């Protein structure tokens, strides 16, 4: 009876998932490409816990994404191109969407600041100035380069981008312990809600990044046919403007469109 109940649950979820993808015109291949860009097996798209989260939370994630787009539209392409220049998958941008809504002045009670919610110690280790006079975590260009550097170092340590994202959230030490307990670095093992190798916040964090990236990739659903946004940014030119000291932490750039 228990086996039958489990089997029926799987069937219901699979049927619901199929209906969801059809209803929302989701392109499986685009979704799979996002997984691959983050070093995740394409089979993860069928993971039951992932599918349940996508079905139940997509509307909320979409609303959060649209709010960030509406408020920070011009910055999205700039940030994605910085990630691209640093050889970091542009899907990583959705980490910042989740952490701060792309708000430059975002601050947490724990002391994390800026678009990427960097802690002081991490920011300083990545070369940013953080003191009583200047906090370069508030500089969107410098902080994005610092976050890209940090994520690249985590990727070098653990070998996969999704592991770098997990470590970004819970810390590299916690991830090492989780991998040791799980005996594997496979995403399904690490995010298993029954085994709890990583905390609930971290499990939700990674799934939310993936799902938000997948929502954003459906351009027709979000922003029509604008080719500049999300996971396919065009090249643009960015030039800094020298300003007075009082505005050092301001996000002031001259942007030249690359449209042809």
Regions found by a protein language model. Give the residues of each.
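Positively charged n-region of N-terminal signal peptides that target proteins for export
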Residues: 1-5
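Bacterial N-terminal signal peptides
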Residues: 6-15
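An acidic, Gly/Ser/Thr/Pro-rich helix-cap/linker signature
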Residues: 15-87, 256-259
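Solvent-exposed, acidic/flexible segments
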Residues: 62-76, 85-88, 108-116, 136-144, ...
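Short, functionally critical alpha-helical segments immediately adjacent to catalytic or ligand/cofactor-binding
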Residues: 88-105, 164-169
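Substrate-binding/active-site groove segments that recognize
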Residues: 110-132, 140, 144-147, 151, ...
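Catalytic and binding regions of secreted/periplasmic enzymes and modules that target cell-wall glycans
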Residues: 151-182
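Low-complexity, Gly/Ser/Thr/Pro-rich intrinsically disordered linker/tail segments
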Residues: 221-260
